[in-house]
Amino acid sequence: LSVVELFIGFEYNEIDKLEFVRVIMIKFLNDIRNVEKPISNNRKIINTIAVLFLGIALGTFSKFLDFRQAELPSVLMAINGVLDIGNFLGRFAIWVLIALCISIYSNSAIRASINVFAFFIGMVASYYLYSNYIAGFFPRSYAMIWFGFTAVSPLLAFVCWYARGKSKLAFILSALILAVLFNMCFVYGCWYFNAKSVLEVIVFIIGLIVLRRDTLRSSALMGTISIVLAVLLDMVIPFHFG
């Protein structure tokens, strides 16, 4: 055989190996969760635009609430005074919950990545554009955290989409997601346990509902395992994005 023939044969072998790996990976992921009902391209575009505008609206509202507290309508001011909505929106838990909902209710893992990324692009951009051009300041260090989180959000959304599957791996993934959410919603130690706010308690409960399993027993087991995982995570990574 000539050198060219050997090279071509090597290339074909490499392509075959890559194709084999791709097929195995697709089968592995489909065993966790498969696309249930394909949707049209028009519907995909509409959904992505909708979550983009949702992000823009929530980012703008969050910064408005933070910057214009003294100018809020009396009812909204009273609600904010009781629930401390401004600080609640400044923490991670609510945004992680919204992203989780967008992810698992998307049509596929790829769509979850696109939709969640669009949401965070809209939310983070509107928040910091408002902060810079209307409020007149730009908190660079805090913004860098959100920019980084936005950059990795497609990967996280891709993984989270599979949490609604029926396999054992999906069950473990759901428990791990809840563990992260638990550490964002609660502060605890050897002799104390507190919720950051009543709104964070609601966030965690909604997370449980969204990730619930087919039976009450399985859901309760998932919640219990998530708390154990949360404590273990707290030992390894004591810093929380809260």
Residues covered by each model-derived region:
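Central hydrophobic cores of alpha-helical transmembrane segments
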Residues: I114-M123, I172-L181, S218-A230
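Juxtamembrane boundary at the C-terminal end of a transmembrane helix
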Residues: L232-G242
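Membrane-helix boundary connector in multi-pass membrane proteins
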Residues: C185-S197, F204-A220
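N-terminal amphipathic/basic-hydrophobic helices that include classical n-h-c signal peptides
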Residues: L1-M25
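Hydrophobic cores of alpha-helical transmembrane segments in multi-pass inner/ER membrane proteins
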Residues: A93-S103, F149-W161, I202-G207
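N-terminal topogenic module of multi-pass integral membrane proteins
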Residues: I26-V124, Y128
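Membrane-proximal helix-loop-helix units in multi-pass membrane proteins
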Residues: Y128-N194
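Membrane-water interface at the C-terminal end of transmembrane alpha helices
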Residues: L155-A170, L208-M222, L232-D234
